[in-house]
Amino acid sequence: MSTSVSFARDTPTSNATLMRKYDAVAYAAKSNALSHPDHIAVVATLFGLDPADVATCRVLELGCSDGANLLPMAASLTDASFVGCDLSPRAITAARSAVAELGLSNVALFEGDLSAMPETLGDFDYMIAHGVYSWVPATVRDALFALARRRLKRNGILFVSYNVYPGCHVRKAVWESLHLHVERIEGASARLDAARAFAAALAEPGTTQNPIDALLRHEFRQVTQITDSALYHDDLAEPNDPVYFHELASPRRQNGDRNALRAQRVTISVLSPRRSFR
């Protein structure tokens, strides 16, 4: 039987704002093969780590949304156990419905802030934070790694995906211009329409041969083609903060968190710069 529990309902203002945004426009979650424990375990082994047996592992996904990534894992690994956590009541409700429809008995779902997850959940062999790190406040980022330090088992693996510099510098320029254009516009639908119209205008072919102009036009053209979900929760999201790898790794090294650092090295080695993280 799946577990359905709410916790930390008195979330900070920043988290409450994030929760409202995800309830205003549903995030179209999808599965990500790179975050599957089987894939993580293989790559981790190649890097000299000794990960847990995937068949009987314990997995925690932070920001599980409606379960599109977590539930297929649970359905295929019936002797493993899975826990999903998300701020959005709308997403967790959808995930619970899917668990019931699929008849899964190895899934527990929690609605609330990851920094206040109950100790009764136990420890985990694999922790997944896909499409979370770059889109949450600094306090939540710190809480993510603090949780990993407390709750990862020996030889546990933390999978983190995030927007990374220097590759995101051009995209960041596009995101900032979109933000400036829509900052005074109220309502999700109106903001989406305005952002698309703005991007379409700037994607029009220009007369210059400047390669930077061509690159920017390409990025604006991409904005006109992505889904409302991706535009609202990625390009128009606040925060949306890419980081350099050393910014992610250095604090973990200073805290003596060698396993998290090694896991980050594994993760960054298998994520192509052309892949969409979310």
Specify the residue positions occupied by each region the protein language model found.
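Conserved class I S-adenosyl-L-methionine
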Residues: 55-65, 157-186, 190, 194-211
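Conserved alpha-helix/loop element of class I SAM-dependent methyltransferases that forms part
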Residues: 24, 32-57, 72
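Conserved SAM-binding loop of SAM-dependent methyltransferases across substrates and taxa
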Residues: 66-79
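A short acidic, Gly/Pro-enriched loop at the edge of an enzyme's catalytic core
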Residues: 118-127
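A short glycine-rich, Lys/Arg-flanked "PGG" loop and its adjoining helix->strand segment in the class I
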Residues: 142-154
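Conserved SAM-binding strand-loop segment of SAM-dependent methyltransferases
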Residues: 103-114
